Amino acid sequence: MHRGLGSVRHGVAQVFLSLALSLPALAQQQPIPSAPPAAAPAEDGQWTMPAKNYASTRYSELDQINTENVKNLQVAFTFSTGVNKGQESAPLVVGSTMYVLSPYPNILYALDLTQPGAPLKWQYNPKPDSAAQGVACCDVVNRGPTFANGKIFFTTLDAHVVAVNADTGEEVWKTKLGDINKGETMTMAPLVVKDKVIVGISGGEYGVRGWIQALDANSGQSVWKAYSTGPDQDVKIGPNFKPFYDSDKGKDLGISTWPPNAWEQGGGTVWGWISYDPELNLIYHGTANPGPWNANQRPGDNKWTAGIFARDADTGEARWFYQTAPHDLHDWDNINELILLDLEWEGKPRKVLVHPGRTGFVYVIDRTTGEVLSAKPFHALTAVTGVDLKTGRIQYNADKEPVNNRVVRDICPTASGGKDWNPSAFSHKTGILYIPHSNLCMDWESVEPNYIAGTPYVGAEVRMFPGPGGHMGEFSAWDIRAGKELWTINERFPLWSGAVATAGDVVFYGTMDGWFKAVHARTGEVLWQFKTDSGIIGQPTTYRGPDGKQYVAILSGVGGWAGAIVSGDLDPRDGTAALGFVNAMRELKNVTTKGGTLYVFKLP
């Protein structure tokens, strides 16, 4: 159901259509935020990195497909990845070639867009170690490749980074960065900044120690590496580190905010999105949950997990840090997208970072200092009551704090957060942020785990279930300055796909029951939808083909953490399976099956 501005959030579903239709006029009266010019260059019709640009807006200036003609979209071609696992990747387009990366075994395909049906030009198989599948937390997914300087860069599940010649498919270099015997894997999309390929490690549910690392794009050799826990030297905290909040100031907090030696298995992995401001020469990245999930075993703030770092792109030196969830209680990894915008805030120009977080808040943060300007909830909340802007600290609800060997009920949001990794999109035309997210709550029981390298290190039994209203997914339009929802589309299942906004006033996203949808960017009206052969958890992209026409691409193939019940053939009777997601997703098996197909659409 479409829900207008006047409806009660998570309350009775009621549509005020006239008010919803007035939103375009309201939005146009306000100054439209813009991305830094260098971080969001002029539209060239390509899609060379998953986030579209360094500012991570996922916005295209292409407008051939618009609100009037999108209803006429039809399939241009399809392509099978040959892998029926979770397809989280973003198809890239560079010149007249499309690049598609599969989940494990991480095969890279190049398709010729100049020919009818886009035939295969070449494929590259990195042949990752099959044992990596056994230590992948949440399906054998990969979030996509990136292109720079004639090469395609991507990660493999067995913790390698690969560079491939974009024209020929020949391997240029391949570098091993992790040890699957310790539970270290890689699933993230790299970011290339100047001559460096920046990547991070996965494995937070296995007691690994998180890090981010820059490799030389020409050789694959390590240039710098920064850990998320441990002494300042390891975290690359030095004299230029100037966090905004007092709780982040002090020496070696990556040790002192943990029990003795616990930081060595402390998590804080870096498996999500990275943004870059060329004017400030700063990269921005999140850090994931501390380990184990059971917070009773790790008293303290557990620096530097569950937060956001700003780092010098050349050296990795930390400039500031903000912790969204000190002493994280509920697995609220802070790895979601970090959208860079230049806007007027309370009468002053600000360089901000907009972050729809796992905690259920949309944060607006000054990206030069780390000061939180706003933190407004976009998800039903019971576990927290707000964020204190003076201290920056989230306010936990004591009644929902986990206790060993006792079930704490009705915690909202869940361990998967108000939203997970699946990225939002920001339209420079409407000035609106479009957020694909969940509507889930959970019951949680903490238990005591023991650390054994290469085995799960969690310490919690979780059961998720639908949030208020009974639906589990929402696609929301968000007013950044006002800190409020403009309209929301309710979906039966959690939204696990990304979003793309276009200058044609059309926004695209997919659902876990297999629908690829186009909605009106200003009103939320569903203008077109197409049923694919499997649930969608991928990232849509749009591009201008060699024929001058606009196309839209999406990978279909259910899986990931939310869809593991299907992709992993899990028993629906075990509600704690997939770290609690099976309890909420039992019906998914009845509406979709495994898949692995690329769909590309165009106008007639």
Predicted feature locations:
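N-terminal pre-domain segments of enzymes
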Residues: 28-63, 588-592
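Repeat-solenoid scaffold signature
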Residues: 185-221, 328-390, 400-412, 416-421, ...
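Beta-propeller blade signature
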Residues: 169, 210-221, 301-316, 366-370, ...
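Short, conserved, GDST-rich strand-edge loop motifs in beta-rich repeat architectures
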Residues: 199-211, 257-259, 285-302, 408, ...
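Extracytoplasmic beta-rich repeat domains
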Residues: 79-90, 123-146, 174-189, 227-273, ...
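Bacterial N-terminal signal peptides
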Residues: 11-25
